[in-house]
Design a protein with these regions (language model features):
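Generic local-structure boundary detector
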Residues: 18, 22, 37, 58-60, ...
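Glycine-rich adenosine-cofactor-binding loop
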Residues: 1-4, 11-54
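Hydrophobic, Leu/Ile/Phe/Ala-enriched alpha-helical segments that form helix-helix packing faces
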Residues: 11, 15, 36, 40, ...
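Short, solvent-exposed coil/turn linker segments
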Residues: 16-17, 63-66, 130
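A polyampholytic, Gly/Pro-enriched intrinsically disordered region
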Residues: 21-24, 74-76, 122-126
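Rossmann-like adenosine-cofactor binding region
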Residues: 59-108
Length: 145
């Protein structure tokens, strides 16, 4: 649950409007890719599945028929050369400095925020910090080590 809706939360953070039926291009077919496609479709977006190391299940590929340009590209295979807005789910000690590359830390933080908001402490949802604040704090903490 948090993988897919974490990507939706990150997309919204980076200005993607789900009222406009945004297009997601996704490469990969593992559980995170499946959750992401399901969440994106449930929010009213459209998806184009690209071949990767693993493909999405056939019943999901049949729902991924967009031929439009992507508002967001997510690469679960870490092999993207897209010039558009790209989310790389994995991360290392290096931060992406390019404006069109979204560091995987955003997805990690979004997943944790959703877990707290939905699973662990829904009664405290309004008191949780913002995605942006947690990202800045994580980066700051990493510089201290």
């Amino acid at each position: 649950m948090t993988d897919g809706y974490g990507v939706v939360l990150v997309a919204k953070q980076f200005g993607i409007d789900f009222d406009a039926k945004p297009i997601l291009h996704v490469k990969g077919g593992g559980s995170s890719a499946i959750a992401t496609v399901n969440a994106w479709l449930s929010m009213g977006g459209e998806v184009k599945a690209l071949s990767g190391r693993r493909d999405l299940p056939e019943e999901l590929i049949s729902k991924c028929n967009s031929e439009l340009d992507a508002n967001l590209f997510i690469d679960f295979d870490d092999s993207s050369d897209s010039d558009g807005l790209v989310l790389f789910p994995s991360y290392s000690s290096d931060l992406y400095a390019l404006s069109n590359k979204i560091d995987g830390r955003w997805m990690l933080i979004a997943q944790h925020l959703l877990a707290w908001a939905v699973l662990f402490s829904p009664e405290e949802q309004k008191n949780l910090p913002s995605l942006d604040l947690l990202f800045r704090r994580l980066v700051l903490l990493e510089t201290l080590t």
